[in-house]
């Protein structure tokens, strides 16, 4: 009888420890993803460099234009 009680207590303790470690891992994963997304956004913002347009003829605007594909900072 003591064996079964000890076995049940060990199983309950193991299941409690598993759920605690799983919840810590999930919150850690969310914060890690947020950190990675922030680093990527900062890197993308730093990669935006103005590049001079080709001034082929009269009437062309020689203002710098961003290379970033998402940004629309090229005004015509």
From Swiss-Prot:
Protein name: Conotoxin Cal5a L2
Any one GO cellular component localisation term in the record: extracellular region
Sequence positions bearing 4-hydroxyproline: 50, 58, 62, 64
Extent of the signal sequence: 1-22
Domain remarks: The cysteine framework is V (CC-CC).
Domain of life, source organism: Eukaryota
Post-translational modification: Contains 2 disulfide bonds that can be either 'C1-C3, C2-C4' or 'C1-C4, C2-C3', since these disulfide connectivities have been observed for conotoxins with cysteine framework V (for examples, see AC P0DQQ7 and AC P81755).
Family: Belongs to the conotoxin T superfamily.
